[in-house]
A protein has these predicted regions:
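Alpha-helical segment of the N-proximal tetratricopeptide repeat
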Residues: 9-38, 42
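Alpha-helical repeat scaffolds
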Residues: 31-39, 65-76, 109-122, 144-155
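Canonical tetratricopeptide repeat
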Residues: 50, 84, 97, 130-131
Length: 292
């Protein structure tokens, strides 16, 4: 009898396979989406997998499919009376609400997002969405003057984007022979990384159709430039560009270990251009160009 029970549980889910799939979401979302689709076909009663799958679809921009998966998973879960009467159903609803909030953010429906955050303070605290509450408030134009001076870098950029502020913020990711840099920063570009040229090409190549949507207010793009820098003490040929959602306003740029399995834009053609005889450090060139 016990064996039959175990056999039945395996028909509903596979915790090992599910865990393996979740582990590749950040590094290879396209493969994760494909694998989750196959997983759901094998285990259609694993309702949480629909939420994970929908989140990935949002990340890669397949919005209609994400909406269909959310609807299908919700309907199947609600049709199962045993599941609805279990403690897991409450957890399922919380996960469902999270992906629905992300959907609101993707569609820039910030008013509904803000109203939900205001009306559900306990859920906001439990799911650590205080930043999302503030950001949605900013997007709705409800921030007051007393709060402006206290805004974090990201919040202030959402409120009123300033490229000079971005350039100053970016210095922590640039190495220099003549000045120290914060060794606590996990991702740093190499000294010979041509930041100015690369930034120009980034602006020229950013295409909203190629974005990845992470979190609630940010888009992410991946670029390749061989030997660009290091991330977590490992050399890498890729870097990430984070922008405010659905805009070309750049929040930060940093080397990444995750670009290999994402759609990325190759900027190695810059390497073929003539290099100056006398090399200046990144920060030297940076200051020469942007110094007031």
């Amino acid at each position: 009898m016990k064996k039959d029970k175990n056999k039945k549980s395996k028909e509903y889910f596979n915790c090992w396979e599910y865990s393996d799939l979740k582990s590749i979401i950040m590094s290879n979302p396209l493969l994760a989406a494909e694998k989750f689709k196959q997983y759901i076909e094998k285990y259609p009663k694993d309702y949480f997998s629909y939420i994970s799958y929908a989140n990935i679809l949002l990340t890669i921009g397949n919005i209609k499919e994400a909406e269909n998966v959310i609807k299908l998973g919700s309907n199947l879960a609600n049709e199962n009376s045993n599941f609805k009467n279990s403690n897991k159903y409450r957890d399922f609803l919380e996960s469902l609400n999270y992906v629905l909030l992300r959907l609101l953010a993707y569609n820039e429906n910030y008013t509904k997002l803000y109203e939900y955050c205001i009306n559900n303070p306990e859920k906001i605290r439990k799911n650590d969405l205080n930043s999302e509450l503030l950001f949605s408030k900013i997007k709705c134009g409800l921030i007051n003057e007393n709060e402006i001076s206290k805004l974090s870098y990201k919040a202030s950029q959402l409120f009123n984007y300033d490229e000079k502020l971005f350039l100053e913020h970016e210095k922590k990711h640039l190495k220099s022979e003549d000045s120290s840099y914060d060794t606590n920063v996990s991702s740093v570009f190499n000294i010979d990384f041509p930041f100015e040229k690369v930034l120009k090409e980034i602006k020229r190549n950013i295409n909203l159709d190629n974005k990845y949507f992470y979190g609630f207010f940010e888009d992410k793009y991946f670029f390749r430039y061989d030997g660009c820098g290091e991330a977590f003490h490992k050399n890498t040929d890729y870097f990430e560009v984070i922008t405010i959602h659905n805009t070309n306003n750049i929040l930060t740029i940093y080397p990444s270990l995750d670009g290999k399995f994402h759609n990325n834009i190759d900027l190695n053609y810059i390497l073929l251009e003539d290099v100056p005889t006398r090399k200046l450090s990144q920060i030297d060139k940076f200051n020469m160009r942007y110094k007031k």
